């Protein structure tokens, strides 16, 4: 709430902050009330002892004081727990209760003095030990309470409190000159107060001119940021809790929406179809990522002995002590003759720690050339090393490790980069620009780079490349230093780990992508804070405080695991009403105009290391490890502070190092993320990526049997998850890796005996499932197509992230021509392991049908007649089977294949080759365009003797083809040939294999004005397969692929 006003002055404490102090004092006074009552009324005193009589009189008076304190503290507790954060009317009488409690405190102070007098007179001469001990305890307790209250008053004292009250009273009247004078006085007083706090914070450091300037600049920055803001520190804590709950609620709401492209949230960042994962299967990409991990060791070493001991608290101290000359051998030289060390401590611990860091990592080819431990405002420590293995000269800059570094961080105004000959406005973080200029000046004065490149001419150090690295403050300084050094070193590279968010202007940020690679881990706070980001954060914080109707103590306690209940308002209408009614109560909080800060962004191309959040297990169960992924981040996406307990922990340098390594570990274990139109990874926020793939076998539905060979398709009616689910709640039932119902073993075996293609795919799917389990691949499902959703309808579940298009016509098996039997199969999964190519499996199994090529030409199979007559839409599969059985007994039954001369064929048939290419084309991930006929009207190759060409099209087909000519973006992609297929990506890349609009929305290609039967007839994809040899004009089997 706003600061409480007592004695006509505002204090930096709210009336709802007194709950815990009042409870503590109430319990303390209650305890002493019970003890003193037992001592006074339960013991017998000697009437001849003066000390005992004085104790009884003093104790009775103190009992009354204790009783008064208890009553006043109960009233404070009751009042403090009423109302909301900004709803202060129920607590208006708090100041009067405090007046009463302070009056009682004065009486306590008098009784404490009387107790001291009694102790000086009777403590040595009194023989009653009980009386002496009780009196001594009361006196000590009284003085502890009094001193605590005095210290609290000093802490919550606001020097500008009187001016603030006057300004608020004046603002209620018409604005005049007095209002502006009071506002100016308030801002100056706040700046002076902040400057005083900074000086107290840095009381042990020597003050220089630059440091004094930093004090003034940061003080005015804080005064500007908290101007006219009537909140107390506890309000910020409660606001953070509410803001975190709001962010989580928004993410869940986004996942519940049907009209968005967000598949999941990893580390608070949305994952969409356009999210680019690092393709670690690409050798060039893998080498680049390993280079990023390698140079993180140089950035970590720059922190010297504090970080070395933090990483190795036990053996690290022994390693440093063994190398320190001041501890063991003062006369022993510690470094090579060419090493320069500036302003290290007497033992040289920082330089020794840097050296030990590389030795522990077996990096013996790294030579330290120069080490500067000089630490001041705008002057950051750094070191220069030569890496002979990589043939690089490395400049590593230390991050924030001292209060002086914090002053450099807080000087966040925009400063022009001292670089000439560029286009646009290049601005940077002022503190880091000054630090980069200092390092550049130091390198030139000491000729450090000349020494490094001339370190060992025999090894060719003259031709080594230059690398600049840093973490946190060092990352921002390294990026700006790269701007200053790039004119002399055009091949320079920079690696910035956890850089600050408000670092570079947009023009400079775009240019830095040519040579800067930045790394951000998870929900790290630092890459998301700058002046512009903090201003937006302040507005969000005030907004959640305005909308909150709960008491502050309940909000803060609700953030703990004891009471994990959301304190966000449930009824949005009620919240809006309450907020509008409180608008006039605190207008200064709600109408604050944000300052016009120049937007600054993180530098370079950003590698964002994200991870999922496994469900919390019970205390007796082992917690699962999160799975880490690396994606390419957008510099402008880090514009919002994500509130999380990990936002500070994930900024530590050794935690960043662990996160980078875990990406490689997960990749080596086979934990990749691959999404396509028919293969969708379950959201890592819901399902932990573990090797255990749980297949839930569900019973078949009751009803009439389906036609032979028709794959079972049931409606997928599950709703999209709205919150993070546990692993058991997110287990998927798979049918050949398709989301839907699972065929029973008997039904699967029966279908396999009748259909060789289904037999082939069933064995392939089993092998793929076993290998995916052994490779710890992520759970993957194929989007099922229910009989209540069209071919272009995607279920909007959280596990897939697709949007659902409701109300489309039901899908039935509608045949347009009197052709052969239909094979209804599920498409194979895009190969993630090259050894499991669906094309390879098909070609190997084609030996079963090689006899068709040897004994029966394609012309005989197709027949020499014209186009087969069209079949009425009302025809069923049973009628077709009956017709097929009456047309000559030479036609082999469906699914029955004979062997040629008792052996298998040696090469596949052209029809199976075409079918294999079609299967591969379903999972084409390239960006080529296609016509409608390329995928929806696939025919057999034209033959000079075959009349099986394009037959007359129905009106529905002609209208669709005509529409596809004018709307080329609505058609699927072309089939991808196996030989020219792109390398599989290890990142999530969803191929838009279904029609999309210009806005990314899924569209229905069904022409208007057609019946459902005619529309569904166009959804069939045909390819021809021979049904046997020795048959006269044979019916062509339609192979309908249901992408599920």
UniProtKB/Swiss-Prot annotation:
Gene null: resulting phenotype: Deficient mice are viable, fertile and display normal physiological behaviors. Deficient mice show 80-90% reductions in brain 2-AG as well as the downstream product arachidonic acid (AA), in particular in neurons and astrocytes. The endocannabinoid-mediated retrograde synaptic suppression of neurotransmitter release is absent in the cerebellum, hippocampus, and striatum of knockout mice. In addition, reduction in adult neurogenesis is observed in deficient mice in both the hippocampus and the subventricular zone. DAGLA deletion increases anxiety-like and depressive behaviors.
Cofactor section: Ca(2+)
GO BP terms in the entry: arachidonate metabolic process; cannabinoid biosynthetic process; diacylglycerol catabolic process; monoacylglycerol biosynthetic process; neuroblast proliferation; neurogenesis; regulation of neuroinflammatory response; retrograde trans-synaptic signaling by endocannabinoid
Nucleus keyword on record: no
Superkingdom to which the source organism belongs: Eukaryota
Active site feature: 472, 524
Membrane topology: Multi-pass membrane protein
Residues the record lists as Phosphoserine modifications: 728, 730, 733, 744, 784, 786, 808, 810, 835, 849, 954
Inhibition and activation profile: Inhibited by 1,2,3-triazole urea covalent inhibitor KT172, DH376 and DO34. Inhibited by p-hydroxy-mercuri-benzoate and HgCl(2), but not to PMSF. Also inhibited by RHC80267. Diacylglycerol lipase activity is inhibited by the phosphorylation of Ser-784 and Ser-810 by CAMK2A.
Cellular location(s): Cell membrane; Cell projection, Dendritic spine membrane; Postsynaptic density membrane; Early endosome membrane
Name of the featured protein: Diacylglycerol lipase-alpha
Source species: Mus musculus
Name of the gene this protein is made from: Dagla
């Amino acid at each position: 709430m706003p600061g409480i006003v007592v004695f006509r002055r505002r204090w930096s404490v709210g009336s709802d902050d007194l709950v815990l102090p009042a409870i503590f004092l109430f319990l303390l006074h209650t305890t002493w009330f019970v003890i003193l009552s037992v001592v006074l009324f339960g013991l017998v005193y000697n009437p001849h002892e003066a000390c005992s009589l004085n104790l009884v009189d003093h104790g009775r008076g103190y009992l009354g004081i204790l009783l008064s304190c208890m009553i006043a503290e109960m009233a404070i507790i009751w009042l403090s727990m009423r109302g909301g954060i900004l709803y202060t009317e129920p607590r208006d009488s708090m100041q009067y209760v405090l007046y009463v409690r302070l009056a009682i405190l004065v009486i306590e102070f008098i009784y404490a003095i009387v107790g001291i007098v009694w102790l000086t007179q009777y403590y040595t001469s009194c023989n009653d030990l009980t009386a002496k001990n009780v009196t001594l305890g009361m006196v000590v307790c009284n003085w502890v309470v009094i001193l605590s209250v005095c210290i609290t008053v000093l802490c919550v004292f606001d020097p500008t409190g009187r001016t603030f009250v006057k300004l608020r009273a004046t603002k209620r009247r018409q604005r005049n000159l007095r209002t502006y004078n009071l506002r100016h006085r308030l801002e100056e007083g706040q700046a002076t107060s902040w400057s005083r706090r900074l000086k107290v914070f840095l009381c042990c450091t020597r003050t220089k001119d630059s440091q004094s300037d930093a004090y003034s600049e940061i003080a005015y920055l804080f005064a500007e940021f908290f101007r006219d803001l009537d909140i107390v520190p506890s309000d910020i804590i409660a606001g953070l809790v509410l803001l975190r709950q709001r962010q989580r609620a928004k993410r869940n709401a986004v996942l519940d929406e049907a009209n968005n492209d967000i598949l999941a949230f990893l580390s608070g960042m949305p994952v969409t179809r356009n999210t680019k994962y690092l393709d670690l299967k690409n050798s060039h990409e893998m080498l680049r990522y390993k280079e990023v991990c390698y140079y993180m060791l140089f950035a970590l070493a720059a922190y010297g002995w504090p970080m070395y001991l933090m990483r190795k608290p036990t053996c690290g101290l022994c390693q440093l002590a063994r190398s320190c000359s001041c501890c063991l051998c003062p006369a022993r030289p510690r470094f090579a003759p060419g090493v320069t060390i500036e302003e290290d401590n007497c033992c040289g611990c920082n330089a020794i720690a840097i050296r030990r860091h590389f030795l522990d990592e077996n990096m013996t080819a790294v030579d330290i050339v120069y080490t500067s431990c000089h630490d001041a405002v705008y002057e950051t420590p750094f070191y220069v090393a030569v890496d002979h293995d990589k043939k690089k000269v490395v400049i590593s800059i230390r991050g924030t490790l001292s209060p002086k570094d914090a002053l450099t961080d807080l000087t966040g105004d925009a400063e022009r980069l001292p670089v000439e000959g560029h286009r646009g406005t290049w601005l940077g973080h002022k503190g880091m620009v000054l630090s980069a200029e200092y390092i550049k000046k130091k390198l030139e004065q000491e000729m450090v780079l000349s020494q490094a490149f001339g370190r060992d001419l025999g090894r060719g150090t003259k031709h080594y490349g230059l690398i600049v690295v840093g973490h946190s403050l060092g990352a921002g300084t390294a990026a700006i230093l790269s701007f200053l050094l790039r004119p002399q070193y055009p091949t320079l590279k920079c690696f910035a780990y956890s850089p600050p968010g408000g670092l570079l202007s947009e023009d400079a940020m775009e240019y830095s992508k040519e040579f800067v690679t930045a790394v951000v881990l998870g929900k790290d706070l630092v890459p998301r804070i700058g002046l512009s980001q903090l201003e937006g954060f302040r507005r969000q914080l005030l907004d959640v405080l305005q909308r909150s109707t709960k008491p502050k103590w309940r909000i803060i306690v609700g953030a703990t695991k004891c009471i994990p209940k959301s304190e966000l308002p449930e009824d949005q209408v009620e919240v809006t009403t309450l907020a509008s009614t409180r608008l006039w109560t605190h207008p200064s909080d709600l109408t604050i105009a944000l300052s016009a800060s120049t937007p600054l962004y993180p530098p370079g191309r950003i590698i964002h290391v994200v991870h999922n959040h496994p469900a919390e297990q019970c205390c007796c169960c082992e917690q699962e490890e999160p799975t880490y992924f690396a994606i390419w981040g957008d510099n402008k996406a880090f514009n919002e502070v994500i509130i999380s307990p990990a936002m500070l922990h994930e900024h530590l340098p050794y935690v960043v190092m662990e996160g980078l390594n875990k990406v490689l570990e997960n990749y080596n274990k086979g934990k990749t993320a691959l999404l396509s139109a028919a293969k969708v990874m379950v959201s890592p926020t819901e399902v932990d990526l573990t090797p255990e793939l749980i297949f839930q076998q569900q019973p078949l539905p009751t009803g009439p049997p389906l036609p032979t060979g028709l794959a079972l398709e049931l409606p997928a009616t599950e709703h999209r998850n709205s919150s993070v689910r546990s692993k058991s709640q997110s287990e998927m039932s798979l049918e050949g890796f398709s989301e839907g119902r699972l065929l029973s073993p008997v039904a699967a075996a029966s279908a396999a005996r009748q259909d060789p293609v289904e037999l082939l795919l069933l064995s392939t799917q089993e092998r793929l499932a076993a290998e995916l389990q052994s490779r710890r691949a992520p759970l993957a499902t194929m989007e099922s197509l229910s009989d209540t959703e069209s071919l272009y309808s995607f279920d909007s579940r959280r596990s897939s992230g697709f949007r659902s298009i409701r109300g489309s016509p039901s899908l039935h098996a509608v045949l347009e021509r009197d052709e052969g039997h239909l094979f209804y199969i599920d498409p194979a999964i895009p190969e993630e392991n090259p050894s499991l190519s669906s094309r390879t499996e098909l070609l190997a199994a084609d030996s079963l049908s090689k006899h068709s090529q040897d004994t029966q030409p394609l012309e005989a199979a197709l027949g020499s007649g014209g186009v087969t007559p069209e079949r009425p839409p009302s025809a069923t599969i049973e009628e077709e089977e009956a017709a097929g059985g009456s047309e000559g007994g030479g036609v082999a039954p469906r699914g029955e294949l004979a062997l040629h001369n008792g052996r298998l064929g040696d090469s596949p048939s052209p029809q199976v080759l075409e079918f294999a290419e079609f299967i591969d084309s379903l999972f084409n991930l390239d960006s080529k365009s296609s016509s409608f006929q390329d995928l929806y009207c696939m025919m057999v190759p034209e033959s000079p003797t075959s009349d099986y060409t394009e037959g007359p099209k129905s009106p529905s087909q002609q209208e669709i083809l005509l529409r596809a000519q004018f709307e080329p973006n609505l058609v699927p992609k072309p089939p991808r040939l196996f030989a020219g297929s792109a390398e599989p990506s290890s990142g999530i890349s969803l191929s838009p294999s279904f029609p999309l609009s210009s806005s990314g929305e899924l569209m229905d290609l069904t022409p208007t004005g057609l019946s459902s039967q005619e529309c569904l007839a166009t959804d069939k994809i045909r390819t021809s397969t021979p049904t046997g040899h020795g048959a006269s004009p044979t019916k062509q089997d339609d192979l309908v692929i249901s992408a599920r």
